[in-house]
Amino acid sequence: MSIAEKIRNIAADARQAAIAMAKLSASAKNELLLAMAGSLVRNTVQLIEENRKDLEAGEAKGLSTAMLDRLMLNEARIKAMADGLREVAALSDPVGEVTRMWTRPNGLRVGKMRIPLGVIGIIYEARPNVTADAAALCLKSGNSVILRGGSEAIHSNLAIARILGEELKRAGIPAAALSVVPFPEREGVLEMLKQEEFIDLIIPRGGESLIRFVVENSRIPVIKHYKGVCHVFVDADADFDMAEKIIVNGKVQRPGVCNALETLLVHKDIAETFIPRIAETLIELKVELRGDDCVRQFVPQATKATEDDWHAEYLELILAVRVVDDLDEAVAHINRYGSLHTEAIVTRDYHNAQRFIREVNSSTVLVNASTRFADGNQLGLGAEIGISTTKLHSFGPMGLEDLTTTKFIVYGDGQVRP
């Protein structure tokens, strides 16, 4: 059987399993996830053995130390995966929730009820923990899931899926509710992206090149975010101490994540006093500054910023800095160069804060808080499947609710249309 035929069979089986998943009660799904968590811990030795195969292959290929670290499973990381499953089990189940109900003049009662999407495909890179995390979220929201992880983690991913799949069987749920594409070749991804008959949604998790590849080759709707070009605007009346804390946290705490700060905008009225202060702090923290001409008047050691810098997601200790005339120019800059991810304003002016919230066209907008809060857990969603910077079907950090859709439900007592 060819790869194309095998992928089609996996997708068709997942579609059938989705019918069974949609019928499960919240308690049945929670019991399943708790059983899966326990099974991961019990099989720690087996998982580490399978993961060692990936690590040895990665070392032979010359993978970087950082990549090998992302790939590695140990006892603590397996326990963390299990804890993640337990946390998802503790979340409220969105399936079956009636979000609105109203009565028509003819007596019909109309409502909208949350239902699973169906079959979700997750395409990701060399992070075995995503196999368990993504599976938990999809299953809890009543969906089937097809996982295609990076080829570097093929042994780890298959082992995790096999362990979780055994618990599906014990619970009397079709094992096809959780599948892993077992082919490391790119052909496996391409064939998966053709299965629009069976797969309802694709969620890619990884770098910009992976996401663009998926978008360009998929026949299935894709939830995506290419990159996180996140901004902080320091308004004219901002509290300097607060602004400094927010900027340092956004840039320095974890510079390699998508909600890290990449561009700082400073109101011209405070540039002369605030920019030297924040520059001194950031330079002490080993941050490279790239500024416009005005910034470089106050910080001569800053590199001259180019047009590319305003578009850049650095993911390292580099920060682009620009002086703007007012709120209008700050908003215009963000809406031109931003990636619809996360933006923040530091201000004491309520009117300016409200304007910033309304006019900035991004999925998460903060007032007097760090961009690092653009995260499902931090925003109270529980676990997160990813962050979307497209407005269909979801926008911003995605939790369980975002893995559902709604259908209309209508109650009558014999009404017919005149």
Curated annotation (Swiss-Prot):
<dbReference type="GO" id="GO:0050661">
    <property type="term" value="F:NADP binding"/>
</dbReference>
<comment type="similarity">
    <text>Belongs to the gamma-glutamyl phosphate reductase family.</text>
</comment>
<dbReference type="Pfam" id="PF00171">
    <property type="entry name" value="Aldedh"/>
</dbReference>
<dbReference type="InterPro" id="IPR020593">
    <property type="entry name" value="G-glutamylP_reductase_CS"/>
</dbReference>
<dbReference type="GO" id="GO:0005737">
    <property type="term" value="C:cytoplasm"/>
</dbReference>
<dbReference type="InterPro" id="IPR012134">
    <property type="entry name" value="Glu-5-SA_DH"/>
</dbReference>
<keyword id="KW-0963">Cytoplasm</keyword>
<dbReference type="InterPro" id="IPR016162">
    <property type="entry name" value="Ald_DH_N"/>
</dbReference>
<dbReference type="InterPro" id="IPR016161">
    <property type="entry name" value="Ald_DH/histidinol_DH"/>
</dbReference>
<keyword id="KW-0521">NADP</keyword>
<dbReference type="InterPro" id="IPR000965">
    <property type="entry name" value="GPR_dom"/>
</dbReference>
<keyword id="KW-0641">Proline biosynthesis</keyword>
<dbReference type="GO" id="GO:0004350">
    <property type="term" value="F:glutamate-5-semialdehyde dehydrogenase activity"/>
</dbReference>
<keyword id="KW-0560">Oxidoreductase</keyword>
<dbReference type="GO" id="GO:0055129">
    <property type="term" value="P:L-proline biosynthetic process"/>
</dbReference>
<protein>
    <recommendedName>
        <fullName>Gamma-glutamyl phosphate reductase</fullName>
        <ecNumber>1.2.1.41</ecNumber>
    </recommendedName>
</protein>
<keyword id="KW-0028">Amino-acid biosynthesis</keyword>
<dbReference type="InterPro" id="IPR015590">
    <property type="entry name" value="Aldehyde_DH_dom"/>
</dbReference>
<comment type="function">
    <text>Catalyzes the NADPH-dependent reduction of L-glutamate 5-phosphate into L-glutamate 5-semialdehyde and phosphate. The product spontaneously undergoes cyclization to form 1-pyrroline-5-carboxylate.</text>
</comment>
<dbReference type="InterPro" id="IPR016163">
    <property type="entry name" value="Ald_DH_C"/>
</dbReference>
<comment type="pathway">
    <text>Amino-acid biosynthesis; L-proline biosynthesis; L-glutamate 5-semialdehyde from L-glutamate: step 2/2.</text>
</comment>
